[in-house]
Regions:
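A long-range scaffold signal marking pre-active-site subdomains of enzyme folds
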Residues: 1-208
Length: 208
């Protein structure tokens, strides 16, 4: 049969809410890649789903600047490239902890380097019917997915018991040229200092 591309035909009467990460600040060529502090969900969401199950049928993400008046503005992709992200939705019965990580083989030092620690989620108590106490979101997670809705097929959802907070781990690369004549140009990419190994042509509209 046919698969509708109109999500309201697949899962009608859905609701949504927004979650903002803490602000990210960086300098040109910085790579921001870290687990951010815990982000509590709104009191309304926590209260509504306390001891209940939330069914998540889709999500989307973006990189935005939030102005003092509360309005949003998408960040140009050539200012900050979202290489990838991982988001963890935590329930009241779960806890994320930081543990020491001992590499099992020497090849680690030839890739990302030794990972001295990692974050894991543990269940502090059982939930009715063994409903999940945490969920992870990291599908199609590159910069090209910004503002693109990730919707699940009919009758499919990620379930979580008593959702309470998010943990977000973005990896973003700062490619915004800070020269005075370019710093506020949102219409096109202006390369800054680049290594000799850069493969992009001089007229490229992207960072190489």
């Amino acid at each position: 049969g046919e698969f509708s591309t109109n999500f309201t035909d697949i899962t009608p009467n859905v609701e949504f809410f927004d979650v903002y990460s803490p602000p990210i600040t960086s300098k040109y060529a910085d790579v921001y890649w870290t687990m951010m502090p815990e982000i509590p969900l709104s009191k309304e969401i926590v209260s509504r789903f306390n001891n209940k199950v939330m069914a998540i049928t889709g999500y989307e993400m973006d990189q935005v600047m939030v102005h003092p008046d509360g309005t949003e503005e998408p960040i140009p992709c050539f200012w900050s490239y979202n290489h990838h992200y991982v988001s963890h939705l935590q329930g009241a019965n779960s806890k994320m902890i930081k543990v020491e990580n001992k590499p099992k083989y020497d090849m680690w030092e030839f890739s990302h380097g030794h990972e001295s620690y990692k974050f894991i989620t543990i269940n502090e108590s059982d939930t009715p019917n063994n409903i999940a106490t945490s969920q992870l979101f990291s599908s199609a997670n590159g910069g090209e997915s910004r503002g693109s809705f990730h919707g699940y097929p009919y009758n499919k959802a990620q379930l979580i018991h008593s959702p309470k907070s998010f943990y977000i781990q973005p990896m973003q690369i700062d490619t915004r040229n800070r020269e005075p004549e370019y710093i506020n140009d949102k219409s096109q990419y202006h390369p800054g200092i680049l290594p000799k190994s850069n493969k992009a042509p001089p007229t490229a509209s992207y960072s190489g």
